[in-house]
């Protein structure tokens, strides 16, 4: 199966792990993703239906607009990728517009622009909920037209919702399969990157997610696959699951020389 890339750049995106994740995802009628992120697993699987959720309202707004107004969105977004908008002055003007706009369609256009023009494609907000990633200084940011159209085509069988992971997992019924890609447990005290939205993801949340996954698999017979870093802590959280270790390359790092392979853990409850 050809691998399809997401149209967004995303911290911890699962494109490099798609083959391994597909190998361990059980068959079912509907795939539920409480942490959809850039959607690489959704884009590279073939379930009859999808329920795709995230706590980031900007992300879900963008996905619904790409699904419902594909041609308009591609046409209008392309104009923001002209050379005249690829400089720091324009970037910060458009970032300010994004942070003050309440118009969903315009916010969706600007969210894609910011994602492709900001530093490392990071998605980060301050405590006021304002997007605050600096300008990335890329020579020619890529406009993901082909990826947008593929996403829209796949979205015909998908429902996008902005909600807490517990509410999404509560939708799981017979025939469903759940894939969870929560904000990763930190490898070290300085490696924590969970503030991609104003709602941070705590150790208690990680433990609660593991408990909920175990509960779903036992009480509702719904299989749940979770991905995370392979650490003593995550192995303890997922002690009731079958564990599979995968090598992957973490691509978001402040120190380029520090970009090395770390073990990833796939925990399957079934």
UniProtKB/Swiss-Prot annotation:
Q: What is its EC number?
A: 2.1.1.72
What happens in the null mutant?
Loss of N6-adenine methylation of 5'-GATC-3' sequences, more sensitive to multiple mutagenic agents.
Pfam families named in the record: MethyltransfD12
Q: What class of enzyme is it?
A: transferase
Q: Which domain of life does this protein belong to?
A: Bacteria
Binding-site residues for S-adenosyl-L-methionine, renumbered to this chain: 10, 14, 54, 181
Which keywords annotate this record? DNA replication, DNA-binding, Methyltransferase, S-adenosyl-L-methionine, Transferase
Key word tRNA processing present: no
Asked if Nuclease is a keyword of the record, the answer is no
Catalytic activity, reaction form: a 2'-deoxyadenosine in DNA + S-adenosyl-L-methionine = an N(6)-methyl-2'-deoxyadenosine in DNA + S-adenosyl-L-homocysteine + H(+)
Query: What is a single molecular function from GO for this protein?
Result: site-specific DNA-methyltransferase (adenine-specific) activity
GO annotation terms (biological process): DNA replication; DNA restriction-modification system; methylation; mismatch repair
The signal peptide annotation in the UniProt record is none
What PANTHER family does the entry give?
DNA ADENINE METHYLASE (PTHR30481:SF3)
Family to which this protein belongs: Belongs to the N(4)/N(6)-methyltransferase family.
Record's function text: Overexpression leads to hypermutability. May be involved in methyl-directed DNA mismatch repair, initiation of chromosome replication and gene expression.
> What is the name of the protein in this document?
DNA adenine methylase
| Species name | Serratia marcescens
**Gene name in the database record:** dam
